[in-house]
UniProtKB/Swiss-Prot annotation:
UniProt cross-references to CDD domains, sorted A to Z: HFD_H3 (cd22911)
Role this protein plays: Core component of nucleosome. Nucleosomes wrap and compact DNA into chromatin, limiting DNA accessibility to the cellular machineries which require DNA as a template. Histones thereby play a central role in transcription regulation, DNA repair, DNA replication and chromosomal stability. DNA accessibility is regulated via a complex set of post-translational modifications of histones, also called histone code, and nucleosome remodeling.
Entry-annotated residues carrying N6-methylated lysine: K15
Keyword Transferase applies: no
UniProt modified residues of type Phosphoserine: S11
The name this protein goes by in its record: Histone H3
Record gene name: hhtA
PTM-bearing positions, type N6,N6,N6-trimethyllysine: K5, K28, K37, K80
Post-translational modification: Phosphorylated to form H3S10ph. H3S10ph promotes subsequent H3K14ac formation and is required for transcriptional activation through TBP recruitment to the promoters.
């Protein structure tokens, strides 16, 4: 192949600019118009783990006192009317109820893990109570 002489040509400035896709153009235009910033969201499970650590550290009662007191009085009325309770008695009842519920949920969680699940279901609570001998 014979060599040819190269002549100088005027530069066109490289490649011609491509047309932007509609979605890219819309994305670039949105922030300049003062778009609303989306609120920050944690990954699923992060807040749950934080709450677990928080409640495991704490010792305060988690059930509100007045609703619990009303429930106790309502249940007690079935046995005898005009019963009176010392505030310390209601406090002791609430303390024991919360301790019972926490241990029940621990056993329920073990039942769910045994079934290769991470979500507890009502059948896990039933199994935990049956294994404890509370329910036949």
């Amino acid at each position: 192949m014979a060599r040819t002489k190269q002549t100088a040509r005027k530069s066109t400035g490289g490649k011609a600019p491509r047309k932007q896709l509609a979605s890219k153009a819309a994305r670039k235009a949105a922030p300049s118009t003062g778009g609303v910033k989306k609120p920050h969201r944690y990954k699923p499970g992060t807040v749950a783990l934080r709450e677990i650590r928080r409640y495991q550290k704490s010792t305060e009662l988690l059930i509100r006192k007045l609703p619990f007191q009303r429930l106790v009085r309502e249940i007690a009325q079935d046995f005898k009317s005009d019963l009176r309770f010392q505030s310390s008695a209601i406090g002791a009842l609430q303390e024991s109820v919360e301790a019972y519920l926490v241990s029940l949920f621990e056993d329920t969680n073990l039942c769910a893990i045994h079934a290769k699940r991470v979500t507890i279901q009502s059948k896990d609570i039933q199994l935990a109570r049956r294994l404890r001998g509370e329910r036949s």
